[in-house]
From Swiss-Prot:
Residues 369-383 have a biased composition (Basic residues). GTP binds at residues 155-162, 202-206, 278-281. It comes from Xenopus tropicalis. It is found in: Nucleus, Nucleolus. Transmembrane segments: none annotated. Gene3D superfamilies: GTP1/OBG domain, P-loop containing nucleotide triphosphate hydrolases. Keywords: GTP-binding, Nucleotide-binding, Nucleus, Ribosome biogenesis. It holds the Pfam family GTP1_OBG. PROSITE patterns: G_OBG, OBG. The keyword Lyase does not apply. GO terms for cellular component: nucleolus. This is GTP-binding protein 10. The gene is gtpbp10.
Length: 383
């Protein structure tokens, strides 16, 4: 069954997925030596994940990108213990990875309500410090957003990902006949006749060695982590980044893309995946597509086409392999239908797994309750 879709236009022209900010905890308050009074602690700086917050909104609202905790209150005759400084809470989107200026990971905020302290307030003045307060912690941190979408497009540059996205969703990514057209994530949304919506993300193209952070490297791969399934897009005629790089066939391209995902994070290979073989309007495309299908039926038998170090530990098993042409529209309705089918299957599986987890949890709780009741029940004595 082929699903037709009514595209929904949604623009993300000024989308940003990383932000550099300055954070500083508030200084502590002065102690009171003659009465032994303690100064108040300086306010911390915390990040809190909230819905409908974007990095762009933060940048627009706080152009100086400086966040400072409140100063702790001084000790006084009326209040020997100074008031703590006000905590500076910065609302950020969920799916944020926080790192230091030197790339050291501080933590992640994956869901709404998660929070993390990124700068500690200074201690108030006490006897041990001659009643002198300490300054708050200060540093520059980076906020990196891992984009959430249902489907993430995976491919080398110029495979036609942007053209494909524009045809199935009416998003408006930049499209041209040269590599690295996409330098920022583009989001499109497919709307089906029953009003089901599926979001699709076109992400910057990979190159060999992306897991080492070459090219767009980690800027691309971090977003793949938060997609529910993968849509590989390969050129049926193969791929060559430049005259100085090796030509790769469509099959070799699939293996290399798999390897990049594996080396970045093995779990990415467990995501449901589809394969769109693009540019089927080219000469001899059908013969090349049939050759690719045969190679994918027995991937291990064709590993010799690549050096051992470029062969993934295990090939991805695609749910569907769809020949398409973003230029002519060939196969696009079939692709849209396959995306919907796999998303529905995945949703059904997740519901079953959740129900099974709840059942097991209920059984364990019931078992504990029975044991507790037996233990607490009065023992009968037999005469």
């Amino acid at each position: 069954m082929v699903w037709c879709c009514r595209p929904l236009l949604r623009k993300y022209g000024n989308f940003i997925d990383n932000l550099r900010i300055y954070v500083k905890g508030g200084a502590g308050g002065m102690g009171l030596p003659r009465l032994g009074g303690q100064g108040g602690k300086g306010g911390d700086v915390k990040l809190v994940a909230k819905k409908e917050v974007t990095l762009k909104k933060i940048k627009d609202k706080f152009p100086h990108k400086r966040f400072i905790g409140g100063v702790g209150g001084n000790s006084s005759v009326r209040a020997l213990k100074g008031q703590p400084g006000e905590v500076c809470q910065v609302e950020v989107p969920s799916g944020i990875v926080i790192t230091t200026e030197h790339g050291v990971k501080i933590g992640e905020l994956d869901k709404e309500g998660d929070e993390i302290r990124v700068a500690r307030g200074g201690q108030g003045g006490v006897f041990q410090t001659d009643f002198l307060p300490s300054k708050g912690q200060k540093r520059i941190i980076h906020l990196d957003l891992k984009l959430i979408s249902d489907v993430g497009l995976v491919g080398f540059p110029n495979a036609g990902k942007s053209s494909l996205l524009s045809r199935i969703s009416h998003a408006k990514p930049q499209v041209a006949e040269y590599a690295f057209t996409t330098v920022k994530p583009e989001l499109g949304r497919i709307m089906y006749p029953d009003y089901k919506q599926i979001s699709v993300a076109d992400l910057p193209g990979l190159i060999e060695g992306a897991h080492y952070n070459r090219g767009m490297g980690h800027k691309f791969l971090k977003h793949i982590e938060r997609t529910r399934q993968l849509l590989f897009v390969v050129d049926v005629a193969g791929f060559q980044l430049s005259a100085s790089t090796l030509y790769r066939s469509a099959f070799e391209t699939v293996l290399l893309l798999t390897l990049e995902l594996q080396l970045y994070k093995q779990e990415l290979l467990d995501k449901p995946a589809l394969l769109a073989v693009n540019k089927m309007d080219l000469p001899n495309a059908n013969e090349k597509f049939e050759e690719l299908l045969k190679q994918l039926e027995n991937p291990a038998g064709n590993f010799h086409l690549l050096p051992d170090e470029l062969v993934p530990e295990r090939p991805i098993e695609f749910k569907h392999i769809i020949p398409v042409s973003a230029a002519t529209g060939q196969g696009l309705e079939n692709l849209i239908g396959c995306i919907r089918k796999t998303m529905d299957e995945q949703a059904d599986m997740e519901i079953r797994e959740l129900a099974q987890e709840r059942l097991q949890s209920l059984q364990k709780e019931t078992s504990r309750t029975v044991k507790r009741n037996l233990k607490n029940s009065p023992q009968r004595t037999h005469h």
